Amino acid sequence: MPGVRMRHIVTRVLQLVLLVLFVASPVRAQDPPPRIPWFVIDAHGSVPRFPSDNQELADSRDMELAELPGRGLGLQLGVHLYPLRWRAITFGVGGELAVSRSNKTPPESTPPLRPAKERYRSLAPQLSFNFGNGNGWSYLSGGIGQSKWAITPEGLEDNPQDDEPLKTINYGGGARWFIKPHVAFSFDVRFYAINPGLAFDGRPASPRTTLMVIGAGVSIK
């Protein structure tokens, strides 16, 4: 329902703001601290929480609910530029590519259930608000782009819904701590609000879905 969905989004944003405030203090005191660098490249391994209890999603692919693969593994790559600072906020612009996958093979004791594969890919620009200095900083960011979400049970490999571009809003936050002059440990918690798809071949449309992805890895400046 729209009201419930809006409350969920507000709750998530407030949680991210509290996280950013918690980690926004400088990593170590310096006078003066270095500014946030002009650019950063991120490379993260990620864990997407693919839904495994969404009957509408299963129906859109002509699947049983128990066939949905669920949690998977992925990769996030990002490039961000930081051209402008105003008081305590450094503004950033950039982009992110996120890819992830999951596989599920049911036990042999459940013959009606089919093996299934799940693939997700998102590409989007991002605007970020950054708090901290060049030794370490936290951020809130978001953007609008497109994604493709393929959920393929065995025997239904040629499904138009798996190749349908879906408008997707991503929003989240994270932090970077520089453990060496040019290398940082970084993490990111991101939500992908995926628009509903179209109905194909007599199957219902895929529902509006929010996918959460947690990533961690390195950043290079």
Language-model segments: residues:
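Outer-membrane beta-barrel translocator domains and adjoining extracellular loop/strand segments
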Residues: D53-R61, N103-P112, A150-N159, G197-P204
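Surface-exposed strand-loop-strand hairpins of Gram-negative outer-membrane beta-barrel proteins
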Residues: V47-L75, E164
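Predominantly the C-terminal beta-signal and adjacent terminal strand-loop region
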Residues: D31-I36, S52-E56, M63, Y171, ...
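Cleavable N-terminal export/targeting peptides
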Residues: M1-I36
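Short, hydrophobic/glycine-enriched beta-strand segments
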Residues: F39-S46
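Gram-negative (and chloroplast) outer-membrane scaffold detector with strong preference
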Residues: V47-R49, L73-G155, T209-K221
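Hydrophobic alpha-helical segments of small multi-pass membrane proteins
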Residues: P125, G142-Q146, E164-A175, V189-F191
